[in-house]
């Protein structure tokens, strides 16, 4: 059993864990993507500026997706790579709460884009590493389906809380909480994988 050998978990447990983790990161991811233009408008900047910031986020996300995941994934594996990108995403979502000057928002947009762009492409890598190769397509699709639900939930949370509070700050704080939830899950999987590798090496050394 590949998942048990590498993580000490059943195939189903790994599938469910990754699905839940994907919801956490994608709730956080969706908030700036869905509400950046409106948020910037609330800060006194025009819609054109908001659109430029959104375009900048998407452009830098493309850099991470096309180059960053391959670079880090080859060296550190899928779990550590997604931990890096999810950490960057969460950090700059938190920074967005306090960014009010335009240059600060541009800086946040660049680094948030670099972070979020590398998150979703890591899930197929992780599925391929830890789940049966013959089931990669189906299991990746299930994870991405849950991630899509997280995107929808994050977008809705942002709008619903804005209607109540008149600000996106609370929504961004909740998004950071979801991001931390994702990091805790991924960090736990990294810990389990490291422990399993040590156990295998100790078993080989004792023979």
What positions do the PLM features span?
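Structural signature of the two symmetry-related core transmembrane helices
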Residues: 80-94
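Helix-to-loop junctions at the C-terminal end of transmembrane segments
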Residues: 64-77, 163
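Intracellular juxtamembrane helix-capping segments at the cytosolic ends
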Residues: 118-131
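Paired small-residue
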Residues: 92, 103-111
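Multi-pass alpha-helical transporter architecture, strongest
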Residues: 175-207
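Extracytoplasmic gate region of multi-pass secondary transporters
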Residues: 10-69
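Residue-level signature of mid-helix packing/kink "hotspots" within the transmembrane helices
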Residues: 58-66, 117, 148-152
